[in-house]
């Protein structure tokens, strides 16, 4: 058994950092050591920022984004085309699409995908909120931007079924060859999707 080299407070910091996606135990130890060595410049301001975030962060009641205001910054942006809603699995997907800045639309965060094996059904996701938004009118297009997994496909089909009969165009993100991608390195599923979604040039 490894000997303890720090007090319980630093051990707790390491354990909590290790729970952050992308940080394993070793990375968490390095991050914790870096933080405590730069206590005034990093640890103090980080603790303060995290405390403030803990007090102020809310889930947007309209789209499901995280922000310090409700409705969120995205939903209150008057320059957005609110007749187009991009449906995403998670807030991280919303942020990724915003970085691309390709479509100045509204968003709707589902909070995951349908997964019967994991016990995740329609009531566990923000699907009813989406159906209600479309039912209110004013939405001409729904862009379903979920991952190209079995669960993502199942979720997309379920949403399409729920919106049947409503006057809304439903589209999906194109799947296929990434920009700068070489065909030899792509899997068969990606190549098949790319061939089926081919466009005229």
From Swiss-Prot:
GO terms for molecular function: DNA binding; zinc ion binding. Gene3D superfamilies: 3.40.1360.10, 6.10.250.240, RecR Domain 1. A zinc finger (C4-type) spans 60-75. InterPro entries: DNA_Rcmb_RecR, Rcmb_RecR, Rcmb_RecR_Znf, TOPRIM_dom, TOPRIM_RecR. SUPFAM superfamilies: Recombination protein RecR. It comes from Sinorhizobium fredii (strain NBRC 101917 / NGR234). This is Recombination protein RecR. Belongs to the RecR family. The keyword Zinc applies. The keyword Metal-binding applies. One of its GO terms (biological process) is DNA repair. It comes from the Bacteria. The gene is recR. PANTHER family: RECOMBINATION PROTEIN RECR (PTHR30446:SF0). Keywords: DNA damage, DNA recombination, DNA repair, Metal-binding, Zinc, Zinc-finger. May play a role in DNA repair. It seems to be involved in an RecBC-independent recombinational process of DNA repair. It may act with RecF and RecO.
